[in-house]
Amino acid sequence: MGIEEKLPSGFLLTTVEGLAGYVRKGSLWPASFGLACCAIEMMATAGGRFDIARFGMEAFRASPRQADLMIVAGRVSQKMAPVLRQIYDQMVEPKWVLAMGVCASSGGMFNNYAIVQGVDHIVPVDIYLPGCPPRPEMLLNAILTLHEKIQQMPLGVHREEVARAAEQAALAATPTIQMKGLLR
C-alpha cells in the first residue's frame, strides 16, 4: 500500500513510525468483553473518579468492527470461547487484547473443565492484568503500559509477522480441556 510496506521496518521511517505510534496509542477504541466481577471495575474506570476519557477511550464500542482493543474482563467458559474468538477476528487491525483479572489470565480459582484456563489459549494477549478483581487504577496502569508498547510497535510488514507469530503460538497451545491442573 504505502512506503512502510516497501521498505524494511525501521529504515528511513523512524520518525514516521514514532508519529504513527503516538497517534495510535492516543486513539484506542476498546470493546469490553465483561463476563464477571472484573467488568464492574472496568465500568468504574469510565466514571468521573478515574476518568478513562483522559486517554481517549471515553466510549466503549459495542461493535468489534469499531474497536481495536479488547478488554477481556472475567472468566471465559468453554462455550463462550468460540464467541470470543469470533469477536477477535472481527476487530480491525492493528488490534490488541488486555486480559483483565486472574480469571482471564489463568482461569483463576475455577480449575475445572468448564472454564478456559487463560484467554491466551484462544486469542493472543498483549497485556496481563492481575488481581481479583483488579482496581481501576491497575487497569489505567495496564492501559498506559499498552500505550508504551504501541508507541514502540513498528509499521508495515514486520508488524504483521509479529502478529502472525503470536497467533500461531496461541493456536499451538494445549487446549484447556486437555490441561491437568492441581485438582485433577
UniProtKB/Swiss-Prot annotation:
InterPro entries the UniProt entry points to: NADH_UbQ_OxRdtase-like_20kDa, NADH_UQ_OxRdtase_20Kd_su
Molecular function per GO: 4 iron, 4 sulfur cluster binding; iron ion binding; NADH dehydrogenase (ubiquinone) activity; NADH:ubiquinone reductase (non-electrogenic) activity; quinone binding
Binding site for [4Fe-4S] cluster: C37, C38, C103, C132
Listed SUPFAM superfamilies: HydA/Nqo6-like
GO cellular component terms attached to this protein's record: plasma membrane; respiratory chain complex I
Source domain of life: Bacteria
Membrane-related topology note: Peripheral membrane protein
Localization per Swiss-Prot or TrEMBL: Cell membrane
Keywords: 4Fe-4S, Cell membrane, Iron, Iron-sulfur, Membrane, Metal-binding, NAD, Quinone, Translocase, Transport
Pfam families: Oxidored_q6 (PF01058)
Annotated PROSITE patterns: COMPLEX1_20K
Stated family: Belongs to the complex I 20 kDa subunit family.
Reported function: NDH-1 shuttles electrons from NADH, via FMN and iron-sulfur (Fe-S) centers, to quinones in the respiratory chain. The immediate electron acceptor for the enzyme in this species is believed to be a menaquinone. Couples the redox reaction to proton translocation (for every two electrons transferred, four hydrogen ions are translocated across the cytoplasmic membrane), and thus conserves the redox energy in a proton gradient.
Name of this chain's protein: NADH-quinone oxidoreductase subunit B
Lineage of the species this protein comes from: Bacteria, Bacillati, Actinomycetota, Actinomycetes, Mycobacteriales
